[in-house]
Design a protein with these regions (language model features):
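A surface-exposed partner-binding patch
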Residues: 1-121
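Long, low-complexity, intrinsically disordered segments enriched in glycines and aromatic residues
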Residues: 76-183
Length: 183
């Protein structure tokens, strides 16, 4: 069997395909999963999508155009919450509240939070379309944003797949070091 034939069973990963699959999976009742040592209810609370007028007002308030994949997400669901209450992707109102509260560069908007990781997840609005424009920052401890090398679509797919965990840190161990030059 050729690789192309096997790939017919898979779909192109787009914001629309991710959210469609999420909505279908979300309709399953009483699903529990293993999550960091315990069973938790699996599911998502999806908000009503933002209107074109709400999106225009949002872009006007922040002074930047948002990436098309992120705009597509907001049109489908203006934010979503994980039912384990650990992570969420913010709605426009919450984004604007963060925009006013936190002293971040104006081109960095907080779009998601992860409580267990104590992180804000942001889009760099100065990045070009479909660029690695997603960053994380600890709002208390960090002096800088760290790129997680994803555009919004890739971030959304991974963040939902791992149920809001900080997947960008998996496998990262700064305590295990090896000298690159033998002494």
């Amino acid at each position: 069997m050729m690789l192309d034939e096997r790939m017919e069973d898979y779909f192109e990963i787009t914001v629309k395909s991710i959210l469609k699959s999420l909505s279908e999976a979300n309709n399953t009742n009483n699903t529990e999963i293993y999550y960091y040592g315990s069973k938790v209810k699996y599911g998502f609370n999806l908000n009503k999508g933002a209107t074109d007028k709400e999106l225009r007002n949002f872009e006007t308030k922040i002074g930047y155009k948002i990436p098309s994949d992120y705009k597509e997400f907001l049109q489908y669901t203006n934010g979503l919450e994980f039912q384990n209450d650990d992570a969420k992707i913010l709605d426009i109102k919450e984004i604007l509240e963060c925009y006013e509260i936190f002293d971040y560069p104006k081109h960095m908007i907080i779009i998601a939070t992860s409580l267990s990781s104590q992180l804000h997840i942001a889009i760099n609005l100065l990045s070009s379309e479909n660029d690695n424009n997603i960053y994380v920052v600890d709002p208390i401890a960090d002096d800088y944003f760290i790129s997680i090398k994803s555009d919004f679509t890739e971030f959304l797919n991974r963040f939902l797949s791992c149920y809001g965990s900080d997947y960008w840190n998996w496998g990262l161990d700064t305590s295990d070091k090896v000298l690159k030059i033998e002494e």
